[in-house]
């Protein structure tokens, strides 16, 4: 097949070609991260969520908070549903002995596929809104715009947090369904556009920003009247209303937003207005820096990574503010001469403003994943700048420059994927870029504790104490190290302090429950185990709580707990033994014998089971 034949085939099947190219390049560039472990928020949000692994709970996810705790104020049920499906597939195809790296692979493969589809939709939207002209030189120029934006978006290293980090799927899905909503909107299928908008909102709250983009396309690009555009977009009130109702059902009093953010997650929330605005523009500068030169990437920017701006003459504030003003000018005053640039400015500003902390503080000060949607607008602006260079210099130089950028982005992305290999790798890399990050310090210390590297853990604690002592995580780590040194009084003091700072600190609850159980203070242990399973119903702690209730001669509570959290399927040697023990203490020897015998058949040969079985038989 000659070159002319290939070109002819691609020309006649261009969208299919771009879709295949998107999938191939996405796996080529992000594929080296597929077999990374669950890291950071992946562990609590995805890996250890029992409600995501239970098929009978699937539809309940659509009225459940993103985290177990309503007060966190997050509602992303469609994203949770896709995690659940990943778990179901893992259970069906992977052996029980599979490693966490193997279990995580399917989740990341899905993320890569969604990113490929998103990149394809970027190509489609740019091509649709700014199609090639009939004149061959102009046609080449306009094709360049869509291909350049597509390739820059697909390869940009700032997207590793959204693609390689499993919890980044919320960004990916919100972007996907938002662009699908735009597709059906321009095709005048309002019903499917509304459904797509609802799916986008159910993926992540930031999808609300697609509404001004839809309005802009109808009003400015298609030149409909303001009144006609308003009437056309008002129909989207229905999917928004459905979303609000479901969100209220899931979050109750917290449906308007987060109530748990501390100074550690977002210091901006605790600054006065002028300092918050100035520092927020500094953060915009930092985003801009990473979009232009994505070398210094970090998984965490929380306290005390970003110092507050003390003066409006601070260069980082000035650059961020000037960039913001430029985008606003381009959007409102540049659209007559630079329609492409104006659209790029809108696509950056609409999602950015929702996470910028300029309008109101959000749950975090900064996160690279939050740039997933805004980066489309920025990269469209970059492509537009290169596009304009066609008028100034030989196009071969423009193509060479674009090729160099894409190669650089691709290599940097592949290198960055390796940082997410496992928890130690990730937090070590994070602290190299953000040495004052309290969250990263605590996370690395937790890895040290898991690996019995106690000297290193204590070193991280001492650094953390100098950053910010009055933090729940810091106090919890202090208690863990004290307990390791057999100073149980200090351990108890620090874990209680951790809970004073954050009553929902599940790790401190677990540690106190374990301490009290070890000391024989079973009633107090039971209180904390109950708090744990109310928020974090992992089988291990359900069993611990139930055995605590049995030891307190409260078998009915143990049986109720087993039925509520573990269901009727007790086809597990430890769970059936637990049920048998509860019925034995209750004096229901028939039920006790049934479950104890089942436990033995499943392989639990503990001598206590045999003893209880003999007593049960003697009482029948």
Predicted regions and their residues:
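Polytopic membrane enzymes that build or remodel cell-surface glycoconjugates and lipids
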Residues: 2-487, 500, 504-511
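C-terminal luminal/periplasmic domains and tails of membrane-associated envelope-modifying transferases
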Residues: 2-10, 424-620
């Amino acid at each position: 097949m000659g070159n002319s034949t290939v070109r002819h085939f691609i020309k006649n099947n261009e969208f299919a070609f771009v879709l295949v190219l998107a999938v191939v390049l996405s796996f080529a560039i992000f594929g080296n991260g597929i077999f990374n472990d669950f890291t950071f928020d992946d562990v609590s949000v995805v890996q250890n969520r029992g409600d995501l692994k239970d098929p009978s709970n699937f539809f309940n996810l659509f009225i459940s908070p993103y985290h177990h705790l309503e007060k966190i104020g997050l509602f992303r049920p469609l994203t949770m549903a896709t995690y659940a499906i990943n778990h179901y597939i893992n259970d069906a195809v992977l052996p029980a002995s599979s490693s966490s790296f193997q279990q995580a692979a399917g989740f990341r493969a899905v993320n890569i596929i969604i990113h490929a589809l998103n990149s394809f939709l970027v190509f489609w939207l740019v091509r649709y809104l700014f199609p090639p002209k009939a004149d061959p030189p102009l046609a080449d120029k306009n094709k360049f715009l869509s291909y350049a934006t597509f390739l820059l978006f697909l390869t940009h290293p700032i997207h590793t947090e959204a693609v390689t980090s499993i919890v980044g799927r919320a960004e990916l899905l919100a972007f996907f369904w938002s662009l699908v909503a735009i597709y059906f909107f321009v095709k005048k299928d309002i019903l499917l556009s509304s459904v797509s908008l609802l799916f986008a909102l159910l993926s992540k709250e930031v999808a609300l920003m697609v509404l001004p983009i839809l309005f802009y396309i109808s009003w400015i690009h298609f030149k409909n009247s303001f009144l006609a555009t308003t009437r056309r977009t008002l129909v989207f009130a229905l999917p928004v209303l459905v979303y609000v109702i479901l969100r209220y059902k899931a979050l109750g009093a917290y449906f308007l937003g987060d109530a748990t953010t501390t100074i550690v997650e977002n210091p901006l929330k605790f600054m006065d207005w002028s300092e918050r605005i100035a520092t927020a523009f500094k953060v915009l500068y930092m985003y801009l820096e990473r979009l232009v030169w994505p070398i210094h990437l970090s998984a965490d920017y929380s306290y005390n990574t970003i110092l507050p701006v003390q003066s409006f003459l601070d260069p980082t504030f000035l650059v961020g503010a000037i960039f913001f003003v430029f985008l606003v000018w381009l959007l409102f005053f540049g659209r007559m001469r630079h329609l492409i640039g104006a659209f790029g400015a809108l696509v950056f500003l609409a999602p950015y403003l929702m996470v910028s902390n300029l309008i109101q503080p959000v749950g975090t000060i900064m996160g690279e994943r939050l740039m997933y949607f805004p980066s489309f607008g920025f990269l469209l602006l970059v492509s537009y700048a290169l596009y304009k260079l066609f008028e100034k210099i030989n196009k071969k130089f423009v193509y060479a420059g674009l090729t160099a950028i894409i190669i650089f982005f691709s290599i940097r992305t592949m290198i960055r994927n390796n940082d997410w290999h496992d928890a130690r790798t990730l937090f070590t890399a994070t602290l190299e870029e953000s040495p004052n990050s309290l969250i990263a310090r605590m996370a690395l210390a937790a890895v040290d504790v898991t690996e019995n590297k106690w000297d290193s853990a204590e070193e991280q604690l001492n650094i953390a104490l100098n950053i910010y002592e009055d933090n729940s995580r810091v106090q919890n780590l202090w208690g863990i190290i004290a307990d390791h040194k057999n100073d149980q009084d200090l351990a108890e003091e620090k874990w209680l302090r951790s809970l004073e700072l954050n009553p929902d600190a599940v790790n401190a609850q677990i540690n106190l429950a374990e301490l009290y159980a070890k000391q024989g203070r079973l009633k107090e242990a039971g209180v904390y185990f109950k708090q744990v399973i109310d928020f974090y119903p992992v089988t291990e702690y359900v069993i611990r709580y139930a055995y605590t209730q049995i030891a307190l001669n409260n078998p009915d509570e143990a049986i109720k707990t087993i039925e509520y959290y573990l269901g009727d399927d007790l086809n597990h040697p430890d769970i059936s033994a637990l049920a048998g023990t509860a019925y034995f203490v209750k004096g229901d020897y028939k039920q006790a014998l049934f479950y104890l015998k089942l436990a033995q058949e499943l392989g639990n040969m503990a001598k206590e089971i045999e003893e209880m079985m003999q007593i049960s038989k003697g009482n029948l």
